[in-house]
């Protein structure tokens, strides 16, 4: 019965927050700046050509 094991839910919540924090860190550090640089280069090229 899950009611008898309160540490199971604490464990799930802890690991969920850790995985979410790692995912947000990886997204903000590595993946999102590539999209920002791509968007900036596209707008710069379109301003040069237009």
Swiss-Prot record:
Q: Which InterPro entries match?
A: ATP_synth_su8_fun
Keyword set includes Transferase: no
Q: List keywords of the entry alphabetically.
A: ATP synthesis, CF(0), Hydrogen ion transport, Ion transport, Membrane, Mitochondrion, Transmembrane, Transmembrane helix, Transport
Q: Where are the transmembrane segments?
A: 13-32
Task: Give GO terms: molecular function aspect only.
Answer: proton-transporting ATP synthase activity, rotational mechanism
Cite the Pfam families for this sequence.
Fun_ATP-synt_8
Stated membrane topology is:
Single-pass membrane protein
The compartments listed are: Mitochondrion membrane
Task: Show the GO cellular component annotation of the record.
Answer: mitochondrial membrane; proton-transporting ATP synthase complex
Q: How does it assemble?
A: F-type ATPases have 2 components, CF(1) - the catalytic core - and CF(0) - the membrane proton channel.
Which PANTHER family does this entry report, sorted A to Z?
ATP SYNTHASE PROTEIN 8
Describe its function: Mitochondrial membrane ATP synthase (F(1)F(0) ATP synthase or Complex V) produces ATP from ADP in the presence of a proton gradient across the membrane which is generated by electron transport complexes of the respiratory chain. F-type ATPases consist of two structural domains, F(1) - containing the extramembraneous catalytic core and F(0) - containing the membrane proton channel, linked together by a central stalk and a peripheral stalk. During catalysis, ATP synthesis in the catalytic domain of F(1) is coupled via a rotary mechanism of the central stalk subunits to proton translocation.
Family affiliation: Belongs to the ATPase protein 8 family.
Q: What is this protein called?
A: ATP synthase protein 8
Which species is the source of this protein? Podospora anserina (strain S / ATCC MYA-4624 / DSM 980 / FGSC 10383) (Pleurage anserina)
């Amino acid at each position: 019965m899950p009611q008898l094991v309160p540490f199971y839910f604490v464990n799930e919540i802890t690991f969920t927050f850790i995985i979410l924090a790692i995912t947000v860190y990886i997204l903000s550090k590595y993946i999102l700046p590539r999209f920002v640089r791509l968007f900036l280069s596209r707008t710069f090229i379109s301003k040069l050509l237009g």
